[in-house]
Amino acid sequence: MLLKSTTRHVHIYAGHVVDGEVHPDTETLTLNVDPDNELEWNEAALAKVEAKFRELVANAAGEDLTEYNLRRIGSDLEHFIRSLLMQGEIGYNLNSRVRNYSLGIPRVNHS
């Protein structure tokens, strides 16, 4: 059985991807960030999300691998991504097929 956690911008699978298919593997966690491309990313922001993911996984070491624990990691990552958006490190992709501003209404800076 494939264990997974999916939020709007974070998909975590207990498995590895081969030719676009996820194969269950309880020794490997695979992270897919923003699969709908709702946000505009830069390398620095993605690196921060990946580092936060590694930190959360390390903090959960020793706990059972359950969907609940994966959901907790996914939820924490979703909040972290929202903080990056609120700090202006990432932004909404206005050309995305999905535009529901799920992390909050965009802010416009007036000069």
Swiss-Prot record:
Its EC number is 7.1.1.-. It is an enzyme of class 7 (translocase). InterPro entries: NdhM. GO terms for cellular component: plasma membrane-derived thylakoid membrane. One of its GO terms (molecular function) is oxidoreductase activity, acting on NAD(P)H, quinone or similar compound as acceptor. It is a peripheral membrane protein. Its main location: membrane. Keywords: Membrane, NAD, NADP, Plastoquinone, Quinone, Thylakoid, Translocase, Transport. It is found in: Cellular thylakoid membrane. It comes from the Bacteria. It catalyses: a plastoquinone + NADH + (n+1) H(+)(in) = a plastoquinol + NAD(+) + n H(+)(out); a plastoquinone + NADPH + (n+1) H(+)(in) = a plastoquinol + NADP(+) + n H(+)(out). NDH-1 shuttles electrons from an unknown electron donor, via FMN and iron-sulfur (Fe-S) centers, to quinones in the respiratory and/or the photosynthetic chain. The immediate electron acceptor for the enzyme in this species is believed to be plastoquinone. Couples the redox reaction to proton translocation, and thus conserves the redox energy in a proton gradient. Cyanobacterial NDH-1 also plays a role in inorganic carbon-concentration. NDH-1 can be composed of about 15 different subunits; different subcomplexes with different compositions have been identified which probably have different functions. Belongs to the complex I NdhM subunit family. This is NAD(P)H-quinone oxidoreductase subunit M. It comes from Thermosynechococcus vestitus (strain NIES-2133 / IAM M-273 / BP-1). The gene is ndhM.
